[in-house]
């Protein structure tokens, strides 16, 4: 179920403060964050966030197309190694 419109997008407060500091300073540094549930806002466009995936911070550069999505969508938590090969077919 989608979030109701009257509530507005969810963003952790500390994230807004960190993004504002980086914008004011003019630095282009990676903003480390653990809040995968936060929504990407238009003021985050052009910034780079390090989204934690459970083991490391994955760098995510925010673009216009990402606005409205969640940060967690761009940092996969699981590694897919493919399905196991058929051992009988391999032996022949």
Swiss-Prot record:
One GO CC term of this entry?
cytoplasm
One GO biological process this protein is involved in is:
translation
What lineage, starting at the top, does this entry show? Bacteria, Pseudomonadati, Pseudomonadota, Alphaproteobacteria, Hyphomicrobiales
- UniProt-listed SUPFAM superfamilies: Ribosomal protein S19 (SSF54570)
Tell me the organism.
Answer: Brucella ovis (strain ATCC 25840 / 63/290 / NCTC 10512)
Q: What is this protein called?
A: Small ribosomal subunit protein uS19
Instruction: Give the transmembrane region(s).
Output: none
- Keyword terms, alphabetized: Ribonucleoprotein, Ribosomal protein, RNA-binding, rRNA-binding
Q: What's its job? A: Protein S19 forms a complex with S13 that binds strongly to the 16S ribosomal RNA.
């Amino acid at each position: 179920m989608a979030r109701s419109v009257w509530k507005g997008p969810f963003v952790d407060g500390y994230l807004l403060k960190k993004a504002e500091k980086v914008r004011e300073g003019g630095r282009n540094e990676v903003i480390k964050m653990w809040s995968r549930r936060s929504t990407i806002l238009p003021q985050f466009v052009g910034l780079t966030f390090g989204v934690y995936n459970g083991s490391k911070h994955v760098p995510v550069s925010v673009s216009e197309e990402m606005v409205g999505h969640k940060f967690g969508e761009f940092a996969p938590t699981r590694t897919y190694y493919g399905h196991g090969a058929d051992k009988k077919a391999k032996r022949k």
